Amino acid sequence: LIPSVEMVKFAKNGSTVTTAALKIARAYTGRKYIARCYDHPFFSYDDWFIGDTPLTRGIPEEYHSLTLNFRYNDIASLQQLFDQYPDQIAGVILEPATGSHPENNFLHQVRDLCHRNRALFILDEMITGFRWHLQGAQTYYNVEPDLCTFGKGMANGFSVAAVAGKREYMNVGGIKESGAERVFLTSTTHGAEMCGMGAF
């Protein structure tokens, strides 16, 4: 259905799959820093994101220091991070759009900057997926991510989400991964519940 997607892993909520995407990026690249778009309001309840908000109580400072911020439609702010942290950024995560459309091929510039620096380009399509276009905002804006995440409109409100992308990256968390330690991506008490998958 979606050209960039060669492999999918399902979960129950968006926080789980955005965090899974970052685990894949870190495991694949061997790097620790994540760059996230500061202008997009929510990516996850996990420490990598909440530790970078005012609600840091209970989260060690080390988590905050590993998340870097750039601004939407400001490619210079992302370039500055790559200059400041050369060969250290594992992945860049952002929503394709929220209140503003990407200007001056911003998403394409982000993708190209990621690839020049050997970082993974991750689109969080929790809101835009199956809404901007049946194949996601990535098709609407004609840009192909390395990894992407979906939820919300995916099953009309039922509890199901997905991390998806190129097999080369997704295999890092695959059960058939050999020759390297497998990345533990997702698990949940209610993982076997199938109503959400049925709705999808």
Predicted regions mapped to residue ranges:
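Conserved N-terminal phosphate-binding loop of PLP-dependent enzymes in the Aspartate aminotransferase
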Residues: L1-F200
